[in-house]
């Protein structure tokens, strides 16, 4: 019996929604010197990019770039709008929603975590029911990961 050799020549390409491989032309562009992020060239480039990126997102509204991962954005959303002891309503829709739950708990936010099926989105009827049950209006926010490319919702 021959032993299989799993080593393949060339470069491996990761074929999942993210993180993604960096194309060669982008890697080559990184060979150029950086520009001063406080200088006029950077300001001009930034404004041009922000204006043109509207075409990609098919919007006429301003596009805001948040310099962090999605996890960083979740953390920022929690710490900039809530305090320890605040109550939130959160829904399980997949792996990322459970990570957001963990972040909330680390900030001592009280989480009403509604377990769910990773193959479906949040049921708006359950959101409505939970908010109606909150007679004292303790729920300060509703948190839901509503788009996971991994499970196609």
Residue ranges and their predicted role:
Residues 108-140, 144-147:
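PLP-dependent aminotransferase-class I/II
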Residues 11-67, 71:
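A glycine-/small-polar-enriched, mobile loop at the entrance of the PLP active site in fold-type I
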Residues 152-153:
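Conserved small/polar residues in nucleotide/adenosyl-binding loops
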Residues 99-110:
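Active-site-proximal loop->helix
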Residues 70-71, 147-149:
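Short glycine-rich anion-binding loops that position phosphate/pyrophosphate groups of nucleotides
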Residues 1-9:
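Basic/polar N-terminal segments that are highly enriched at the extreme N-terminus
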Residues 60-89, 93, 97-101:
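Conserved beta-loop-alpha segment that forms the PLP phosphate-binding cup at the N-terminus of a helix
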Residues 12-14, 62-65, 86-89, 111-112, ...:
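Structural motif
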């Amino acid at each position: 019996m021959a032993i299989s050799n799993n080593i393949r020549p060339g470069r491996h390409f990761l074929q999942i929604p993210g993180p993604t491989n960096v194309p060669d032309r982008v890697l080559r562009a990184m060979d150029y010197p950086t520009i001063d992020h406080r200088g006029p060239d950077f300001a001009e480039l930034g404004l041009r990019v922000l204006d043109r990126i509207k075409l990609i997102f098919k919007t006429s509204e301003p596009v805001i770039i948040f310099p962090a991962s999605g996890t960083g954005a979740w953390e920022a959303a929690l710490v900039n709008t809530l305090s320890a002891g605040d109550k939130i309503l959160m829904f399980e829709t997949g792996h990322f929603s459970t990570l957001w739950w963990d972040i909330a708990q680390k900030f001592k936010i009280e989480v009403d975590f509604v377990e769910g099926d990773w193959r479906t989105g949040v049921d708006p009827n359950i959101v409505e029911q939970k908010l109606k049950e909150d007679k004292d209006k303790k729920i300060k926010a509703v948190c839901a990961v509503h788009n996971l490319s991994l499970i196609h919702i």
